[in-house]
Amino acid sequence: MIFHKEGSAYNLGIRLADKINEWLYNYEHPIQVHIGSDGDPFASHVYRHFMEQTPERDNIKYSILTNGLMFKEFYNTVPHVINNLQELGVSIDGASKETYEKLRLGGKWEKIIEGLECISELKKKHDFRFILHFVVQKDNYHEMEKIIDLGEQYGADRVWLNKIEDWGTMDDFRTQDIFKTPEYQHTLAKLVQRIHKRDDRFIECPTLISEAVRYKNKN
């Protein structure tokens, strides 16, 4: 992802964004365009340029994955995307100020809450799917139920909880591997009880369940 506004990488990104928009303008069949997954798109000048210039066409639907911190500041600059938004995902790995600001370096709890409030209001108007994504790890597993509460509070359609994975970017991934500890197992059991009580698909945690099953079968 490109965060600056100069240099060859930025210029190449702008040209590519314009080419994609030109292609979208002439494309007549239904299509969904996903924006994000490699960083926050609202923090990228190239992504923002793409979203600002994208054509308004009924056949184009959009999905966005964002960390939510800059959404309120920039959503009104990309009306064509918001008007045709099908799904908005927010990655948030803490359900309290202390945990959130520990895991999201530079992030402010008050700002993400403002973002969630803004998204909640926009959802009422545009009726897009709103999903929270929560990566479970050592410093936040105790907030698995709290993130469910947060999703309910701000009108999310679903909350995804996924086990942290080792992508080779951590110095010692073993320090994050809390998934066999009694404390984590107890917390997961409470979450599973809550899933059964809801009897719907608001809470999704397939990687957590499969990990627990593997651990149980080994023992």
Model-based region annotation:
Residues 37-39, 68, 94, 106-107:
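Glycine-centered flexibility sites
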